[in-house]
Amino acid sequence: MSSFRWVRPLQLTLALIKPDAVANPVISEAVHQKILENNFLIIRHKELHWRSTDSQRFYCEHKGRFFYQRLVEFMSSGPMQAYILAHEDAVQLWRNLMGPTKVFRARIVAPGTVRGDLGLTDTRNTTHGSDSVESACREITFFFPEFNTSDWYEKQEPRYRTGPVFYDEERSEHRLEGE
């Protein structure tokens, strides 16, 4: 049982563990543990494997950029994990925990971050995270179409904020007591 008590409203963000990290169980577990150690609530979690068309749809804003094709192919190269995370400033906190996109820079200016410690290249940089609250809502819907963000904020957020909440190891998600 966890005694999470939050002062401010919780915010949701999407976190992806990319195929390079999921391919290595030690790295995948290390990222999962960093999420828990930084007191994120894991609202939803699933493993999935994209088709190339899924990757193209998700990264359509980057079409025409030099890295687009490499990114599309990489993101459909193997299984990945998707998380809906909650925290008071979830978007910014997850971005801080990930570190800079460019792995070489992350190693120098942000050691201790996921990308600084575990990233391989600028494409194989272990993680993705939403860059704004608006992006988070859009991206959560892309990966979890059955999840209603508005409904969660209205009905579930106050309950997760005040607890009690427990971590269900079998599902790798936090749950409200009694559910």
Curated annotation (Swiss-Prot):
Belongs to the NDK family. Major role in the synthesis of nucleoside triphosphates other than ATP. The ATP gamma phosphate is transferred to the NDP beta phosphate via a ping-pong mechanism, using a phosphorylated active-site intermediate. Keywords: ATP-binding, Kinase, Magnesium, Metal-binding, Nucleotide metabolism, Nucleotide-binding, Transferase. Disulfide bonds: none annotated. It catalyses: a 2'-deoxyribonucleoside 5'-diphosphate + ATP = a 2'-deoxyribonucleoside 5'-triphosphate + ADP; a ribonucleoside 5'-diphosphate + ATP = a ribonucleoside 5'-triphosphate + ADP. It comes from Xenopus tropicalis (Western clawed frog). InterPro entries: NDK-like_dom, NDK-like_dom_sf, NDPk6, Nucleoside_diP_kinase, Nucleoside_diP_kinase_AS. ATP binds at K18, F67, R95, T101, R115, N125. Its EC number is 2.7.4.6. It comes from the Eukaryota. Pfam families: NDK. The active site is at H128 (pros-phosphohistidine intermediate). The keyword Metal-binding applies. It is an enzyme of class 2 (transferase). The keyword ATP-binding applies. One of its GO terms (biological process) is UTP biosynthetic process. This is Nucleoside diphosphate kinase 6. Its cofactor is Mg(2+). One of its GO terms (molecular function) is nucleoside diphosphate kinase activity. SUPFAM superfamilies: Nucleoside diphosphate kinase, NDK.
